[in-house]
Amino acid sequence: MAKRTKKVGIVGKYGTRYGASLRKMVKKIEISQHAKYTCSFCGKTKMKRRAVGIWHCGSCMKTVAGGAWTYNTTSAVTVKSAIRRLKELKDQ
């Protein structure tokens, strides 16, 4: 694997190519895509990205569709909260 430095982190593999601002954008994306997330089914921090938009929990073996680089997208969170709010209004 390519050598990385303390300052640039995961994008050290690109060296001096592509420009600093583009590498900073890619760094943010790559950190979020390689991170482990909390599984919404079992609650463990085992949710890992398998492919673009495919997330797999190593503990409960559930596979779900999510965002390309993050487990939850902002639009999905908005829709989920709206559905929850509408269900609460319906129950009252």
Curated annotation (Swiss-Prot):
Leader peptide range in chain numbering: none
Residues noted as binding Zn(2+) in the record, renumbered to the chain: 39, 42, 57, 60
GO cellular component: a single term: focal adhesion
Keyword Coiled coil: no
Alphabetic keyword roster: Cytoplasm, Metal-binding, Ribonucleoprotein, Ribosomal protein, Zinc, Zinc-finger
Location(s) in or outside the cell: Cytoplasm
Entry keyword annotation includes Aminoacyl-tRNA synthetase: no
Domain of life: Eukaryota
Stated family: Belongs to the eukaryotic ribosomal protein eL43 family.
Quaternary assembly: Component of the large ribosomal subunit.
Protein function: Component of the large ribosomal subunit. The ribosome is a large ribonucleoprotein complex responsible for the synthesis of proteins in the cell.
Protein name (Swiss-Prot/TrEMBL): Large ribosomal subunit protein eL43
Source species taxonomy: Eukaryota, Metazoa, Chordata, Craniata, Vertebrata
